[in-house]
Regions:
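Non-catalytic accessory regions of SAM-dependent methyltransferases
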Residues: 1-119
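Non-catalytic substrate-recognition/targeting regions of SAM-dependent transferases
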Residues: 103-116, 135-211
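A short interface-forming secondary-structure element
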Residues: 119-132
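Conserved hydrophobic/aromatic pocket- or pore-lining residues that grip, position, or stack substrates
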Residues: 120, 199, 218, 235
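Glycine-rich helix-loop-beta junction characteristic of Rossmann-like nucleotide cofactor-binding loops
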Residues: 221-227
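Conserved class I S-adenosyl-L-methionine
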Residues: 228-235
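Single conserved hydrophobic/aromatic residue that forms the stacking wall/gate
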Residues: 237-248
Length: 248
């Protein structure tokens, strides 16, 4: 159990997902194993949440739950994956599900985990030791969830080639996640459809997780403005074929 000061208590009660090293008043006599779950309480002992402990980061605890009755077994994580996917389906047009962010880190209470879906490939970035420890629970379950919903998943690529991992004591690297009983895909290139435009996405070598999904609505706005015109994009990263923008 980690006891925190009044400042951290206010932040956590307000929804903040992190506990910083300098906000901790009392820690266990023996430090927990790196990446394991610990409880966080106020100065007076009030339960504030449970999260992953990190011995290397200044973010000492990343919360995953504020419910003292939760049991953190595989079923817990499967429910959270299901909720995140169902939420995306509820707020997005069906056509947008071809390429979308499924897991958005702390916003989905998966601290340090990003999962982007590019048609039949998942691009995964793990930035916290807690998520690293349970990825073998999460990733096969997520592939199974999507397949059961009619979305063929050919493979999962780990895009852990980011320096931020070193702050958690994790190595950098990238490569295919070994789904049980499945061979690694032959190619990390896939075709997605966004706003009616087809793009070839290189999930392994594209910037960040492979493609700037957060620019979807900006590209849609540019398409409306550029209709009937020839457009020169001086900062072009991805080229679509066919394209509605008339890019040269």
């Amino acid at each position: 159990v980690y006891k925190v000061n009044k400042h951290a208590e206010g932040l956590l009660v307000g929804g903040h997902p992190w506990v910083y090293e300098n906000d901790i008043l009392e820690a266990p006599g023996t430090a927990p194993e790196n990446g394991t779950l610990v409880d966080v309480v106020s100065k007076k002992g009030r339960y504030l949440g449970t999260g992953f402990f990190s011995e290397h980061s200044k973010i000492r605890v990343r919360l995953i739950s504020r419910n003292a009755n939760d049991r953190f077994d595989a079923a817990f994580w499967h429910r959270k994956l299901q909720w995140a996917w169902e939420y995306r389906k509820s707020v997005m047009d069906p056509a947008d599900l071809d390429a979308c962010r499924i897991i958005f880190g702390e916003a989905d209470a998966f601290p340090g985990l990003t999962v982007d879906k590019f048609h039949d490939l998942l691009s995964v970035q793990v930035l916290s030791v807690g998520m690293e420890r349970i990825q073998d629970i999460l990733l096969p379950a997520l592939a199974e969830l999507l397949r059961a919903d009619g979305f063929p998943i050919r493979g999962i690529l780990l895009r852990n080639d980011v320096a931020l991992r070193e702050k958690e004591g994790l190595p950098q690297g990238k490569g295919w996640y070994p789904l049980p009983g499945e061979a690694a895909p032959d190619s990390a290139v896939t075709e997605i459809t966004e706003n009616g435009v087809k793009y070839l996405v290189d999930v392994e070598n594209g910037q960040k997780t492979g493609f700037f999904l957060d620019q979807k609505y900006n590209r849609r706005a540019v398409a409306r403005l550029a209709a009937g015109h020839t457009v020169l994009d001086l900062s072009l990263i991805h080229i679509s074929e066919p394209t509605r923008l008339g890019m040269i």
